[in-house]
Amino acid sequence: MTEYTPMIKQYLEIKDKYQDAFLFFRLGDFYEMFFEDALNASQILEITLTGREGGTKEKIPMCGVPYHSASGYIDTLIEKGYKVAICEQVEDPKTTKGMVKREVVQLISPGTVMDERGLKAKENNYIASLYCYEGKEYGFAYSDLSTGELKSTVIEASEDRLINELTTLSTRELIVSSSEKEVLSDVMKEQLGLTFSVHEEDTIPAENEKLVTRHMSLSEKRAIGKLLHYLKETQKRDLGHLQQAVHYETSNYMKMDYYSKRNLELAESIRGKGRQGTLLWLLDNTQTAMGGRMLKQWIDRPLIDRKKIIERQNDVSELMAHFFERLELVENLKNVYDLERLAGRVAYGNVNARDLIQLRNSLYQIPRIRATLLSMSSESLTELAEQLDPCEELTEKLEEAIMDSAPISIREGGIIKDGYNSQLDTYRDASRNGKTWIAELERKERELTGIKTLKVGFNRVFGYYIEVTRANTHLLPEGRYERKQTLTNAERYITPELKEKEKLILDAEEKSMELEYQLFSEVREMVKDYIERLQKLAKSVSEIDCLQSFADISEKNHFIRPTLSEDGSLHVKQGRHPVVEKVMGAQSYVANDCDLDENREILLITGPNMSGKSTYMRQVALTAICAQVGCFVPAEEAILPIFDQIFTRIGAADDLIAGQSTFMVEMLEARNAIVHATKDSLILFDEIGRGTATYDGMALAQAIIEYIHENVHAKTLFSTHYHELTDLEKELRGLQNIHVSAVEENGKVVFLHKIKEGPADKSYGIHVAELAELPKSLIERASRILEQLENDDKKIIIASVKQPEEVHEEVQLSMFPLEPEKKASSKETKLLKEIASMNIMQMTPMDAMNKLYELQSKIH
């Protein structure tokens, strides 16, 4: 058996309790890692891997980071989904015999980050927990530890529903029991990209019972208990800022699955995975970090409560009508700090003096914001104004205690104002008077010795000293100066008087700093009493910020207030895609109408690729979402229903992680919509059926349309390249053909991006191929094939190919063979056959480009 050194034994004992985390083991001024941790961390953090004697024949792998710069390395590990256990020395090495005691003081994981540098200002950092009740339902709870938010619900025991909740929240970490982790599929774990943490205890900690209400179900309470236990055990400190758990029902909000949100680019761009080009990016003119976070929550969960939607619309109208007051409101909001996260840091005990200055300055703005809102006539804005608590006593205390120029460090003084504490004033006077005495001493010593360059200085090692250059040391009187330090060109001395004064000054400064830290800690503790009030204030300010953002964006982008229909009808005049319009510019964007009602439930959209079908479909959905979050909408006029759900299938999205083809994903998403949609839902299907053979796809597309028409009655936009489906208008009363128009000018296609009634009269696939610069002979051949198809009832035509010798000459496969003198080469014939068999209308632009590249490579 290996006999390790006592220190390595201690390390291994602690590491055994934190197998799933990197253990940052404090040794002097460094956090060290050993064994497997060292091997992995050295690669991830790109730091030097060394070795240490530990009682074995070979050195133990080791790497480390300085404790004062460890936060950057910790952030890197957390960002990559790892956990870090911080192990500190909990005894003073100077007073301890033998091995210093060490303990893990905090486990930092992706869902428990509290350091500002590891958090994004306008994004929540959610950690969630799960409790499976008899395989029937999930108790689900989540919290943002940095803000104290705590919410819970019960959802169906379905992976799809769980994924929807987790992705809606952009959850960073999920706490499950070992048995629950086994049940969750590996595909789900990989797809979500979140950290899984196993924790078994799920009873509510005694000190947190007040956070749970009686009416909550058992599964909900167990999920909350699991979350609270995990936080308690990993954070090892007071979590007094956690708010009472709020129960929510997913049925109280518009539902959208993960794919729908991604396709519509609500909060994350498909291309760059950032906010740029999303609806959130467009609507976000919030001035505070907490307002930005609330806005994302609103967009993730649009309202279905008519009263609440109208209330927000009224507020936006009122703010738009008071331009100058809104400008004043914006200026005040700019000076409001992140009160939610400040409250969290106060509870954690890691708030500094600068934070308290920001808090005080934020509280200064509250009476001004309140007065501005009260000058308006909106009832709900007045109600919001009256909820604004300026915390006057706290403001006065902070004004009285904290210096405006206070440093970030809380242990070096310079924080507490003069006059706040008489004992502190006494120490400061002693220190200041002493320094005045030092300055006077320097003047007197120069006069006494005649050395004009003599100076009195100070450093932390030697304290106060008198410095004289080597050239002038002979001028010093003998017996009075005691040499303290020799430099290259000077000598440093002390005198009995200087030594005595030094003690008085340093004692006063040390006592002053100790007392300042004590006084600051008392102020910080006092702020804890206001955490709940500050959190309520933060919510009200965030809501005001979101509403002013809606007003500002609506005004700048010429949005109008929509009317909510009672009969489920949708009528949008000159509607626009808000994000595309912003990117292109209002002058370039082509607006379009959209009308849906009980007699016109399905719009079948035809038209060429690149013509704007997908953009049109998305703009209808985004208009509905804008309305249901309470914002105005991009149109000249809009009457909109309240949709309970939106389902989308737009774009080719092979699920590579899950190993599912485009067609399988199409069918799964189609099933999801068909099974769960109601008459109050909106369905957007873009080219359903293109992922399989032509007739299969056409048959499925027709069957899906008929099923929605006969059984679901949801408002539906269905785009297709199957022109044959346009005949359904004659059979299905609630289906209407529309198309995206295009014209030919000088043999070229011009896409007008304008929606018109009726089916498209022809396709423009060959023109698109021409734009892609396929060989001219190939384009001509495709045109002849198309002409023959159109004249011969659309039978599939295959170009003639060279027949095997045993096939008789009279067997003719082509209906229009090449002339003998122009017979194509074997290579050309194969290419022509391949092109003839392609169905360009079923291809996405990316598929087409890939195929063109493949064909060109064969030609060359």
UniProtKB/Swiss-Prot annotation:
ATP binds at G607, P608, N609, M610, S611, G612, K613, S614. Pfam families: MutS_I (PF01624), MutS_II (PF05188), MutS_III (PF05192), MutS_IV (PF05190), MutS_V (PF00488). The keyword Nucleotide-binding applies. GO terms for molecular function: ATP binding; ATP-dependent DNA damage sensor activity; damaged DNA binding; mismatched DNA binding. SUPFAM superfamilies: DNA repair protein MutS, domain I, DNA repair protein MutS, domain II, DNA repair protein MutS, domain III, P-loop containing nucleoside triphosphate hydrolases. One of its GO terms (cellular component) is cytosol. The keyword ATP-binding applies. Transmembrane segments: none annotated. One of its GO terms (biological process) is mismatch repair. Keywords: ATP-binding, DNA damage, DNA repair, DNA-binding, Nucleotide-binding. HAMAP family: MutS. This protein is involved in the repair of mismatches in DNA. It is possible that it carries out the mismatch recognition step. This protein has a weak ATPase activity. Belongs to the DNA mismatch repair MutS family. This is DNA mismatch repair protein MutS. The lineage of its organism: Bacteria, Bacillati, Bacillota, Bacilli, Bacillales. The gene is mutS.
